[in-house]
Amino acid sequence: MARQINIESSVSQVTFISSAIPAVSSSSSITASASLSSSPTTSSSSSSSTNSNFIEEDNSKRKASRRSLSSLVSVEDDDDQNGGGGKRRKTNGGDKHPTYRGVRMRSWGKWVSEIREPRKKSRIWLGTYPTAEMAARAHDVAALAIKGTTAYLNFPKLAGELPRPVTNSPKDIQAAASLAAVNWQDSVNDVSNSEVAEIVEAEPSRAVVAQLFSSDTSTTTTTQSQEYSEASCASTSACTDKDSEEEKLFDLPDLFTDENEMMIRNDAFCYYSSTWQLCGADAGFRLEEPFFLSE
């Protein structure tokens, strides 16, 4: 009886173990399947995050490129100065003037001025000018008309001298800007002309210089002639004095005339008008005692 009970208990244990093994296998399979099912989710989440990062980088690059392109693109009107229907072209940032606002240089050396309308993408064309200063003055007029006292001016000290447009329409602004540029050019020309006049007044004219030079030359010539005449007179007087002295020396009285001749008759020699002769030459030479000849 006891043996039969033991056999039944062992059989029941074996049955329990055999029933437990499928449960364990099923749980392991469930765990494995759960792990397998969770791994695609993880991989999909990582791939989605990578894609989102790539998309964000691509969008940022596109935005940066758009900003650079928008900074390089400007609107200009080559034929119509009213600002409507202008052509779009890419311009280099180096064309802009480093000091004046709203001014840039064309390829052939002229300076253009334009200003953007408030809350609009269009620009008001202010004209083409020979100098950057004229274009800057035109921009100041438009800036005052559009933005008022908050406008950034190239010449803030001269704001009171700028003409004001009748209305804020583009045509009136363009007319006032052109007038300001022309007035600026006229003032510059007046200043240059006054400076030239001052220089001319400060320097003597060629006629005055020539007259002064001729007068100096004539004075010098007269002085030289006077000095020469004085020198010649001095030399003439010296020569005259010398001649008079020589005449005094050689015009001595003739000692051999009249009484003087009788006084020197007894001398051994006498002088007759620059000729020396022996006294008694006419009568011949005689010896008082005869010669005695020895045999």
From Swiss-Prot:
GO biological process: ethylene-activated signaling pathway
Domain of life: Eukaryota
The keyword Membrane appears for this protein: no
One Pfam family in the UniProt entry: AP2
Molecular function GO labels: DNA-binding transcription factor activity; transcription cis-regulatory region binding
Cellular compartment(s): Nucleus
SMART domains attached to this UniProt entry: AP2
DNA-binding interval(s): 99-156
Keywords: Activator, DNA-binding, Ethylene signaling pathway, Nucleus, Transcription, Transcription regulation
InterPro entries (UniProt xref): AP2/ERF_dom (IPR001471), AP2/ERF_dom_sf (IPR036955), AP2/ERF_TF_ERF_subfamily (IPR051032), DNA-bd_dom_sf (IPR016177)
Biased composition (Low complexity): 24-53
Keyword Nuclease: no
Region (Disordered): 24-102
GO CC term, one of those recorded: nucleus
CDD domains: AP2
Location (main, coarse): nucleus
Entry function: Probably acts as a transcriptional activator. Binds to the GCC-box pathogenesis-related promoter element. May be involved in the regulation of gene expression by stress factors and by components of stress signal transduction pathways.
PANTHER family: ETHYLENE-RESPONSIVE TRANSCRIPTION FACTOR ERF034, ETHYLENE-RESPONSIVE TRANSCRIPTION FACTOR ERF042-RELATED
Family label: Belongs to the AP2/ERF transcription factor family. ERF subfamily.
Protein name: Ethylene-responsive transcription factor ERF034
Protein's organism: Arabidopsis thaliana
Gene: ERF034
